Every structure is written in C-alpha cells, then in structure tokens.
Amino acid sequence: MVPLYTDPVRVARMNNEIPQYRESKRANIACKKAIENLLAERFDGMRLHGDCAKELCDEFGADRVGWVLACTVQHFSWDGRFRHHNKLWADEFLIPTDPDDRTTDYCVNYHPEIVNGLIDQYREYVQTLEEENEHDIGLC
C-alpha cells in the first residue's frame, strides 16, 4: 500500500520528495475513483448496501480513505447538504489549500447525501478498529 503523503507540494519540493508526493496523489485519485464506482454499484436509491468503508480501507488504507473523504467535504464546504458533524470531522484534516496541490483531483464527485452515508459508515468502521486496538493493548 502506498503511504499517504499529506504535505503540500511546495514542502515535497523542498524535501526532494516529489516522487512520494506524486505516488500518493495517484493513489488518492485511484481511491476517489474506487469510491465513486462503489457508490454507483451499491447505492440503490435509498441506502448504501454492503460494508463499503471496510472494503475501501482494506484496499487503500483507512488514512487515505479518510483523507479523500475529508478533502471532498472541505472542498464543497459551501454545500449545505453535507452534514454538520461530517464538516466538523473533515475540518480536523489539514488538507493543503494551495492551488498547486490540485486536491480537487481527488474530490469525490457524487451526491453529498450519499457521500454523507459513506462518511458515517467510514467513521463508525474506524471507531470500531480503534476500540479493537484499545482492547488488544489492554490484553497485553
């Protein structure tokens, strides 16, 4: 799995990390496309079927899926259809805002209410993972 690169492109240039930046950005775009494809396949007009968040996290990693979803919400922050609690969650991510970073390349282009459903599913899945890890640590 490709590591998530979260610094802006100007930092990548300064640190000679452009290859890592580009590889991560390609993975972000692939994740965005996978999200859009999964939503198209699994949303029946009323609900999102299956364990979409888990499948995406298994393929791309929870960090990347969260990054792409948060970037989407931040980019469309003006859209009142994104739920307030998801906007607050997305604001916790330090997504680069410089136009050179072109973060819009990996913003999910889907109806906000359906994306809200996936974000809720993702957040619940990540919380479950965190609780399992806490439980495992307590057993040591």
What is each PLM-predicted segment?
Residues M1-R22, Y106-Y122:
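Charged, low-complexity eukaryotic segments
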Residues L4, A12, K33, A70, ...:
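A detector of low-complexity, intrinsically disordered, Ser/Thr/Gly/Pro/Ala-rich segments
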Residues Y5-T6, F82, C140:
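Short, aromatic- and cysteine-enriched interfacial helices/patches
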Residues D7-M46:
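Short terminal alpha-helical segments
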Residues N15, A30-K33, N37, L56, ...:
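Compositionally biased non-globular segments, especially hydrophobic aliphatic-rich helices
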Residues M46-E124:
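Acidic, low-complexity, intrinsically disordered interaction modules
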Residues E124-E130:
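Acidic, serine/threonine- and proline-rich low-complexity intrinsically disordered segments
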Residues E131-C140:
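Non-Sec secretion/translocation targeting segments of pathogen effectors
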